Amino acid sequence: MEENRNEEQYGSDIKIKSPLTAKLENFWYYYKWHSIAALFLVICIVVCSLQMCTKEAVDFNIMYASGSEISRKSVDGDTPAYNRVVSVFDKYVEDADGDGSKNIAFTTYFILSPDEIKEIENTPDKEVNYALMSSDTDALSARFGVGDYYLCFVSEYVYEQYRGTDDLSVFAPIRGYAPKGDNELEYYSDYAIRLDSTPLYKNNPAIRENMPADTLVTIQIKRVVGVGKDNDEKYARAEEVLRKMLSE
């Protein structure tokens, strides 16, 4: 009778929630933002995992830091300068992981010297990209502390900024990598060789056309702290590639 009176008074559309629904609503009320944050974290983990699984393994890393950019843009349908330079490096690099292809990470940094900045500022219709230079300078400083990019091509300005002292330098002595009796190489110091004196420069038009003659060829010191187990292999590959470039 009581139930009938309720139906007459309030109608028959009254819905009684199940205990499970009530618990879910209560949970959502108190833990809504926790749940959203957890879901976001799960999505990030899944996306990063997929990217890591699909990312192509790198066989060799090369660093280039200079005020002379190597364009990645095609001009009149031609192969971009960046791709042409990488194609040259491909001749010296081995397929480290044995997957049938060579994947070279050629990372470039735009770093101007004070003289180059002054020259650009005094040239009509030209301006210095300070934002790019600032971000690249920060990235380069961080990169010099990592053992992935051992083989480096740098401007004289960058070299002087990071060379340090003979007792504490980011670069390793380079004289031991040249063929014995080779007197054609021009050493900027015990740690650097002028690019235009190397077979790499002389025998490859793509290098001559896109990298300044006074670029310096260097190799970083071997890292022993904060590096992966494959660090020894990476350094050995960098040494082998350097020898090939100097003795072609």
Please give the residue ranges for each predicted region.
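N-terminal targeting leaders characterized by basic, low-complexity, disordered sequences
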Residues: 1-5
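Short, membrane-interfacial amphipathic segments enriched in basic
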Residues: 10-22
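Aromatic- and glycine-rich beta-strand/loop motifs that create alpha-glucan
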Residues: 23-30
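Hydrophobic membrane-insertion alpha-helices, especially the h-region
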Residues: 33-52
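Alpha-helical transmembrane signal-anchor/signal-peptide segments
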Residues: 55-67
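Acidic, glycine-anchored loop motifs typical of Ca2+
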Residues: 77-80, 95-126, 130, 183
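Extracytoplasmic "Venus flytrap"/periplasmic binding protein-like
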Residues: 120-122, 129-194
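Bilobed periplasmic-binding protein/Venus flytrap-like ligand-binding cleft at the lobe interface
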Residues: 196-248
